[in-house]
Structures are given as C-alpha cells and as structure tokens.
A protein has these predicted regions:
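Surface/interface-facing alpha-helical segments and adjacent flexible terminal/loop regions used
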Residues: 1-206
Length: 206
C-alpha cells in the first residue's frame, strides 16, 4: 500500500473515492508511515470529495493529526491494536460478525476474492483478508482498476454490502467509545461518514 493523500478537492468523483479508500486503508495499517502522516497534516481541510457531509470529519482528522506527534499516534496504535494476546480493539471483520477470528465470514470473503481473481500476498500482508485495511484496499481496486469486468459499480456494491457495511460501523463504535482512542477515534468518525456516503450512493443504484 503506497497511496498518496488527495491534496485537492478538484479530483473527479471516482478518483476521489479510490483515493479515500486507499488513505483509510493505510491509516488503519501498521506501521503508519511518517510520510503519510506528514501529508495528512499538510492536507487542505475542505472535503476531499464533493459534498459537505465529509467536510467536518475530514477537518477534525487533519486537526488531530496536526495536534499529535508521530510517536503519540504510533503509541496509540500499539495500545489499541497491538500488544501480546487479545487487542483492545479488533480490526478484523470475523470478530464483529461471528465473535471469533478466522471463522465463516473470513472463509466467505476468501471465496468472493477468488471469484474476483484476487488473493492476499503473504509476503507484504501478514494479516488475514478480513482486516479493515485489506477490504478497503479491495474497494480501492474495484473503483480504480482497469478491468471493467471486475472494477465496476455492481461489483463494488456487492462487495461493500457483504464485507464492509456488515461490520465497519461496529468497529467505528468500538474506537469512538474507547477512552484511549484519540487519533483513531477521529479516523473512525471520518470512516463512518465516508461509508455512509458510499451506502447512500449504492442505495441510489438499487
């Protein structure tokens, strides 16, 4: 994952959607790159995608990134998601859908990825495919990919409904309720706003 932040709101809608999926994916992935955080701090605070609904949560995300150091954000990541044994907050869909890791939701996700011709590169991604960063990266591909048979609105809507809409709100709830979450609580609020925009867009297709 090597996404660059959308530093202007003048991007066309599909490019902006793909960029935001990529940025959220990378911000939830460890280790956070100092270069990405530096870009976030320099980003304009108007909404990176058309629509005022995203503007305030985006402004808050940029603001908290500017207010915290790289070390503070890294420490918060380790506190919430790292450590030995059970993390304080899980980043995996199976946990929210079944209460356990590596369960049926992950198996179904792998089947759906196989149908799309996608698979996890174990050399670059040690986490399982139901990690929030992985499913957001898949959505980025479905929005921005060049193969129209795979990267199209129908595939986006189907994958989103099955593997993001079903559990991402619960992850956002957990982060926003956690007393030690600051940067990631704000990221959760922006993520929630973004997926709400996506849900509305897909609903209009139905």
């Amino acid at each position: 994952m090597s996404n660059e932040l959308p530093l202007t709101s003048a991007l066309d809608e599909e490019t902006a959607r793909a960029e935001l999926y990529g940025v959220i994916s990378e911000l939830f992935y460890s280790p956070l790159r100092p270069a990405l955080l530096a870009q976030l701090r320099l980003a304009p605070t108007e909404a990176p995608q058309s629509g005022a609904f995203l503007e305030e949560p985006w402004r808050q995300l940029v603001g908290v990134a500017r207010a915290m150091t790289d070390a503070e954000i890294a420490s918060e990541y380790d506190t919430l998601f790292g450590g030995i044994g059970k993390p304080e907050v899980y980043l995996y869909g199976s946990h929210y859908l079944s209460g356990f890791l590596n369960e049926k939701p992950l198996a179904q996700l792998r089947q759906d990825l196989m149908a799309l011709g996608l698979s996890r590169d174990e050399n670059t991604m040690s986490d399982t495919e139901d990690h929030v960063s992985y499913v957001f990266e898949v959505m980025r591909f479905l929005v921005a990919g060049e193969d129209a048979a795979v990267s199209n609105l129908t595939q986006q809507s189907t994958f989103f409904a099955a593997h993001i809409q079903t559990w991402l709100p619960a992850l956002c709830d957990s982060l926003q309720a956690h007393p030690k979450a600051r940067f990631f609580a704000t990221l959760a609020e922006f993520t929630r706003a973004f997926i709400q925009v996506e849900m509305q867009g897909f609903d209009l297709m139905a």
